Amino acid sequence: MRRSVWLLLLGAGLFLASACKAQQPPTPEYRLTATIKDIMDSMVDPSADVLWESVATIVSATGTEERRPKTDEDWANVRRRAITLVEATNLLKMPNRKVAKAGEKSENPNIELEPEQIEKLLNDDRQAWTTLSTGLFDAASVALQAINAKNAEGLLDAGEKIDAAC
C-alpha cells in the first residue's frame, strides 16, 4: 500500500512538473514560392494602383470627373485590394525570401544592381527592410480603415501615405 501511494505521488509530481513546463509551438514551415519582385509586381503595385485610382479628380477637355467608390460593390473591390496590400507587406518580411530570380532585371531603369547585390544589401540590414515594410503596412492599414468607414477623403489621404511608403 505504501508503495502504491509513493508511486501515485511520484506520478502526480511528474505530471505536474511537465504541465508547468512551457510548451513551445512548432516553428511554422514556410514554403516560399514567390520572390520579393513577384510579390511587388503581382500584389503590391496592382493593389496600390487600385487604391490610388479609386479616389481622384480628373480634369480634361471634356470636363471634370470626380472618382469615388459609390456602391457597396465598389467599396468591396477597393477593400479586397487594401487587404491584399496590407497582407503583402507581411509576405515581404518573411525570412529567406529571394529578391528576384537569378539574372532577372527590374523594369525600373533606375535600378542598376543585380538581384544578388540587392539581396545582400537587404540581408546586411534586415532591420531597415523590416522598417520599410512596416511603414507600408501602416499606410495600407490607414487606407483599410478609411475604406471600412466608406470615407473617400480618408482613402485619398491614405493614398498619399502609401505613395510615400513606396
Label every model-predicted segment.
Residues 1-10:
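Bacterial N-terminal signal peptides that target proteins for export
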Residues 17-19:
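C-terminal motif of bacterial Sec signal peptides marking the signal peptidase cleavage site
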Residues 21-79, 83-86, 90-165:
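Sequence context surrounding c-type heme c attachment/ligation sites in exported
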